[in-house]
UniProtKB/Swiss-Prot annotation:
It comes from the Archaea. Its main location: other. GO terms for cellular component: cytoplasm; gas vesicle. The keyword Cytoplasm applies. The gene is gvpF2. The keyword Transferase does not apply. This is Gas vesicle protein F2. It holds the Pfam family GvpL_GvpF.
């Protein structure tokens, strides 16, 4: 029988043990937590420390993180990038120990917030659109209701805006209402609103990659 390793999805506060029946990476059907002091890693069992990156695997990674958020909408989650698999719990706990200060700081920074995605697209025909005015209007409405925002790639000429916003739970309803107002004010455009997501675009922390690849030597 193959040795089981630990695939890691994200880091949360160690305020409770967590076990979720959810389809994860490499055929996993259950996600659970491995804890070190005030941190818990959300993991599932996996037979390799070098999982193949496929569209289905990335989707499964995101599905587990979504399930964590749905389990407790107020929970702060530091999402890990795809592919973080560790030889065993001892190796993972060692990484958590080494990165504890950075992880605790990040959890504090993102506590009480969620990431929301906003795309605004021009019509597919030749309808003239004042893109500068649209950007100005959308930015004015949404920036005041968020605590952070990032510009994402505009991968098609139709994309006028592609942004991620970090929004506090207390202002989420107001942000939702602002999206409805934008949609009504620009009925010739397509507004795509997604989330909540773990704050991928507002977390810049990389831990344990070398140890994961080396299998915890």
């Amino acid at each position: 029988m193959s040795e089981s390793h630990l695939y890691t999805y994200g880091i949360i506060d160690d305020n409770e043990s967590l076990a979720l029946n959810v389809d994860g990476v490499a055929g996993a059907t259950r996600a659970y937590t491995v804890s070190y002091r005030s941190l818990s890693a959300v993991v599932s069992d996996i037979e390799t420390t070098d999982p193949e990156r496929t569209d289905a695997a990335v989707e499964a990674h995101n599905t587990v993180l979504q399930a964590v958020l749905e389990h407790d909408a107020t929970r702060a989650v530091v999402p890990m990038s795809f592919g973080m698999a560790f030889k065993n719990a001892r190796t993972l706990k060692g990484v958590l120990r080494g990165a504890r200060r950075a992880l605790r700081s990040t959890l504090t920074e993102i506590a009480g917030t969620v990431e929301l995605g906003v795309k605004v697209l021009a019509p597919g025909d030749d309808t003239a659109v004042d893109t500068a005015a649209v950007r100005s209007d959308v930015t004015a409405r949404l920036s005041a209701l968020s605590v952070g925002e990032t510009e994402n790639d505009c991968f098609t000429d139709r994309l006028i805006i592609n942004k991620s916003y970090l929004v506090e739970h207390d202002t989420r309803d107001a942000f939702d209402a602002a999206i409805d107002e934008i949609d009504a004010a620009h009925d010739d455009l397509t507004v795509r609103y997604t989330g909540p997501w773990p704050p991928y675009n507002f977390v810049d922390i990389h831990i344990g990659a070398e140890q994961a690849q080396q299998g915890g030597r």
